[in-house]
Amino acid sequence: MSKRATRHAIEFAHKRILAKNPNGEAFKERYGDSPPGFLVISPSRTCNLHCKGCYDGTEEAPSILSFSTFDRILNEASDLWGMSFVVISGGEPFMYKSDGKNLLDMVEAHPDLYFLVYTNGTQIDRETAERMGELGNITPAISVEGKVKTTEDRRGEGVFGKVMNAFENLRAAGVPFGLSMTATRHNCDELLSDEVVKFYFEEQGAMYAWIFQYMPIGTNYDLSLMITPQQRLNLQRRMWHVIEEKKVFLMDFWNSGTTVHGCLAAGRQAGYFYINWNGDVTPCVFVPYAGANIHEIYKNGGTIMDLMEVDFFKEIRNWQHSYGYKTKPAQTKNLIMPCVHRDHIDVLFPLIKEHKAKPLNQEAAQALTDPKYYEGLHSYDEACAKVLDPVWEKEYLKVNGQGTRIELPAEERPLPETSH
């Protein structure tokens, strides 16, 4: 890594792990809990690819988050929450332009924040990579779907070669980079195969990967693309095997629920809110229903703190606490089924309707009125529970002499079985 990248990585780790957060203490006095840990912001929907099953969905006239509003959001989150980490998504973030400025101008304007950027990688030329290396407080997570053919089947012909060019440019500039991987029913077994792990992490130098199990939202959503319950368990087993054997940093937003005590949505402590290009604020990137709009909040003289008072978000946080966040083991439900959307549709949809959360796009509106969508996810939840509940009970909990469930220490948990 470049010297700047190394310095910023060390400073970020110190802030997140060792340093006290005075802003967080004030927040805790007011709300009874620590503040959200980060934001996910998609400042623009503009993208040069048309990936199959993109989560963005269809909009007639998407906007762009102005540079000034984008900047204000980051300043407020830093000042009021003590936030030191921000995630950027899209669209394609490196195509963002506003008031003659781009994403890297925003990164430069906030040297005290560390930026994780989800990108398709096609815009990372040598000049862009060199500037990222000079800034030091940014790391791109580049989207791949596995091998060459699998990646191009979803993302388009020629994309894999551009990703390889991006890797080369980032290595030359000393920029730490990782991967963003979407697991579907078709590529799930390939995604963390020995061949794929060796290629990306050992040969190309990727330092981490974030795994997203396909969510049936956005463009041409398709429930049949979701990984099966057994594939989901196999992926969890394989993920922990790769972590232990290859020492690779991997996180799966569903299968890693045990490491973060469940769902992170709706501004939970150490969790996040999602803000898109229209200023709409949703609980999660994968819950396309807005409980607020940042432009309206600012118009009414508010700040980002007002998000904590939105009833839709409050109700989700209440559910998180009742489900397993900061609960005793006897009251903790299955944290490898943590998602309020895909794993607990019977919880989410009534809340959306009760609080009149606004669908972000045509597909989100359609899902609310499509009985097959609800029934399909509900059936999926039940099928997953049959496979994953016994794993939760056997591998993460045990019963003591008084018949009380207690959580197994990590060193006592059975090693995951692997089939790869």
Regions found by a protein language model. Give the residues of each.
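C-terminal accessory region of radical SAM enzymes
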Residues: 230-259, 286-346
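Iron-sulfur (Fe-S) cluster-binding segments and ferredoxin-like electron-carrier domains
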Residues: 56-65, 288-293, 343-361
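Short, small/polar residue-rich loop motifs at catalytic or cofactor-binding pockets
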Residues: 264-269
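Flexible glycine/acidic-rich beta-alpha junction loops that bind and position SAM and/or redox cofactors
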Residues: 186-188, 208-229, 251-262, 288-291, ...
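Conserved alpha-helical substructure of the radical SAM core
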Residues: 1-130, 135
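Radical SAM/AdoMet-radical enzyme domain recognition
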Residues: 71-88, 96-212
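C-terminal non-catalytic accessory extensions
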Residues: 362-420
